[in-house]
Amino acid sequence: MTSADPLAALADNYIWMARDASGTTAFAVDPGDAAVVEAWLHDHQLRLAAVLVTHHHGDHTGGVAELAERHRVPVFGPATETIPTVDHPITGGEHFSLEGFGEFRVLDCPGHTAGHIAYLWEGHLFSGDALFAGGCGRVFEGTAGQMHASLQHLAALPADTRVCCGHEYTVKNLEFAHCADPKNDRLAQRLQAARDARAAGQPTVPSTLAEELATNPFLRTDCPELRRAAQDWCGRDLDQAYEVFATLRRWKDTT
């Protein structure tokens, strides 16, 4: 049976390690720290098969060169971003296969960075810094419109998709979400569960897309309550869903 595990790294990053059904090989997603990956491979007696990168930020690529050199494995990453270690550049809409793991689907997710991509594999969405549990990434290189479109693209995936994001930001994300959407009972329950998990030293990820659609404000920009909250915050009418998104993102950036 295939599986994907989040490895805590750096300040609040997650490196995702996925193993094949035979339990002999694994691939790494966004390895910001090679030592964390090496320790996990040693503990589980697994061989590294590939590295997948979602975007160029150093906390997601810091360990790639060391892993690629030591293990001589392919490195997949966004074709439109400059990541020197990527030797298999890919873009959204492409599919590729890895022996023992089957097929991967690549999705374009511009917004956080201009060339950000995500990977869909066996019901797992490796979303990097595009979609978080309870939130989304800051808009650094793209536009709010691009980011909103990217998230809507991800929101159309099957509801049982496991969202494997790049950071442990869930409690802060859900605290903001609860501020913007205080009458959402499911959101309040999820926030408490996330607090309990962190207090116990447990990760809050992966989530499911169904959870995100019910509680993540950045996927719910057509919700009347969130529209009103965003309008109250900015002091003007918001006619389009992407305007609601942009306002929520600016609001979150100030908290």
Curated annotation (Swiss-Prot):
Reactions the enzyme catalyzes: an S-(2-hydroxyacyl)glutathione + H2O = a 2-hydroxy carboxylate + glutathione + H(+)
Residues holding Zn(2+) 2: 59-60, 129, 167
Task performed by this protein: Thiolesterase that catalyzes the hydrolysis of S-D-lactoyl-glutathione to form glutathione and D-lactic acid.
MF (Gene Ontology): hydroxyacylglutathione hydrolase activity; metal ion binding
Subunit annotation: Monomer.
Protein name, entry field: Hydroxyacylglutathione hydrolase
Keywords: Hydrolase, Metal-binding, Zinc
Record text on cofactor binding: Binds 2 Zn(2+) ions per subunit.
Keyword Calcium set for record: no
Biochemical pathway: Secondary metabolite metabolism; methylglyoxal degradation; (R)-lactate from methylglyoxal: step 2/2
NCBIfam families xref list: GSH_gloB (TIGR03413)
